[in-house]
Amino acid sequence: MRLIHALLAIALILPVPASATVRVVATLPSLAAIAREVGGPDATVESMLPPNIDPHFADAKPSLVVTLSRADLLVENGLELEVGWLPALVQQSRNAKIATGANGRFDASTVVRRLEVPRGPVDRAQGDVHPGGNPHFLYDPRAGAAVVRALAARLAAIDPTHAAGFQSRAANVASELETFARTETAAFATLPAGHRTVVTYHRSLIYLCDWLGLTSPISVEPRPGVAPDPAHVAKVLAQLKSLPARVILQEEFYPTSTTTTLARLGAAALVSVEGGTRFDKGKRYIDHLRAISTSIRAALAK
């Protein structure tokens, strides 16, 4: 706690540049990549997490408190994806701009279509089920386009001087994402029907499947966030062979021992996708999605 307070004190005495831009902090690298494109030269953007970290279980590092203390706008995924670590960091930052309900707090989940919204009560026996719906919507460029437009409106409200720039850049990015989404949907539709069934490790790729017209009847995890047991692995293998499913999909931060074995025994390809945009490498959000769709289509076409 003393370290956090010391870091905050240093952050608060640092001067703000005369040519100050909106300081945006995004919880996820894909959100940061979106914010960077919309903000352009009128915003500085930081990502709290790299793409190879599972956002469910990120570490609440003291350095992130300092980052949040200086933010004009916090962009979060929402739907409780960051609930295990973000609230404490925001509280410790003592930054009223990014408090819940403040204009400097942008919840991307409020502007997208949600999948897998539970109809009844949710408890831990069901695994890591999110009461508001599946939070992994950033794997769908159609959702990304909605976030782009809404984020531009929020940036314009915070910095009206540069509103025209935010809106113009957002219009271009959103249009590009929507065109890309339609193109890829059409391309996947040309695959034989029997080539469009996949098995996912976690339920995090459901929006991806919805976008690309893929069927995912079973996951390697028996319940979200619960490690596979031998009985469930045997069930998955049986479905791999009977469907058949040609591809097993998983994000890079999940273990591969079980999926590698399943792929070998089930004569399926294992495709590991990036957990988010390589924001630190200067990659664009659409680059991230294009790499994923290209690798999956190539595996399904074999």
Write out the residue ranges for each language-model feature:
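Extracytoplasmic metal-acquisition and chelation regions
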Residues: A20-K302
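Bacterial N-terminal signal peptides
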Residues: I4-P15
